[in-house]
Amino acid sequence: MKISQVFIFVFLLMISVAWANEAYEEESNYLSERFDADVEEITPEFRGIRCPKSWKCKAFKQRVLKRLLAMLRQHAF
C-alpha cells in the first residue's frame, strides 16, 4: 500500500512541476514583450539620469538598457 501512495505522490508532483514550468515560460515571454515595448519610451530625463555631453548619453543609455534586459532575461525575471 505504501508503494502506491509514494507512486501517486511522485506522479502528482511531476504534473504540478510541469504545469508550473509551462506557466512560468508563458509569463516570461509576456514580460520580455513588455520590456521590448517599453524600452523606447524610457528617456534619461524620465529616469533622472543627467549625462555629461562627452558621454554621448543616448548610446550609453541604450547599452546599459540592453545589458539590463539581457540580465533580466537570463534570470527569467
Curated annotation (Swiss-Prot):
<feature type="signal peptide">
    <location>
        <begin position="1"/>
        <end position="20"/>
    </location>
</feature>
<keyword id="KW-0044">Antibiotic</keyword>
<keyword id="KW-0354">Hemolysis</keyword>
<keyword id="KW-0732">Signal</keyword>
<dbReference type="GO" id="GO:0044179">
    <property type="term" value="P:hemolysis in another organism"/>
</dbReference>
<keyword id="KW-1053">Target membrane</keyword>
<keyword id="KW-0964">Secreted</keyword>
<dbReference type="GO" id="GO:0044218">
    <property type="term" value="C:other organism cell membrane"/>
</dbReference>
<feature type="propeptide">
    <location>
        <begin position="21"/>
        <end position="47"/>
    </location>
</feature>
<keyword id="KW-1015">Disulfide bond</keyword>
<keyword id="KW-0929">Antimicrobial</keyword>
<keyword id="KW-0800">Toxin</keyword>
<protein>
    <recommendedName>
        <fullName>Oxyopinin-4a</fullName>
    </recommendedName>
</protein>
<dbReference type="GO" id="GO:0050829">
    <property type="term" value="P:defense response to Gram-negative bacterium"/>
</dbReference>
<dbReference type="GO" id="GO:0005576">
    <property type="term" value="C:extracellular region"/>
</dbReference>
<keyword id="KW-1052">Target cell membrane</keyword>
<feature type="disulfide bond">
    <location>
        <begin position="51"/>
        <end position="57"/>
    </location>
</feature>
<keyword id="KW-0204">Cytolysis</keyword>
<comment type="function">
    <text>Disrupts cell membranes through the formation of pores. Has antibacterial activity against Gram-positive bacteria S.aureus (MIC=10 uM) and B.subtilis (MIC=0.5 uM) as well as Gram-negative bacteria P.fluorescens (MIC=1 uM) and E.coli (MIC=0.5 uM). Has hemolytic activity against human erythrocytes (EC(50)=7 uM).</text>
</comment>
<keyword id="KW-0472">Membrane</keyword>
<dbReference type="GO" id="GO:0050830">
    <property type="term" value="P:defense response to Gram-positive bacterium"/>
</dbReference>
<dbReference type="GO" id="GO:0090729">
    <property type="term" value="F:toxin activity"/>
</dbReference>
<dbReference type="GO" id="GO:0016020">
    <property type="term" value="C:membrane"/>
</dbReference>
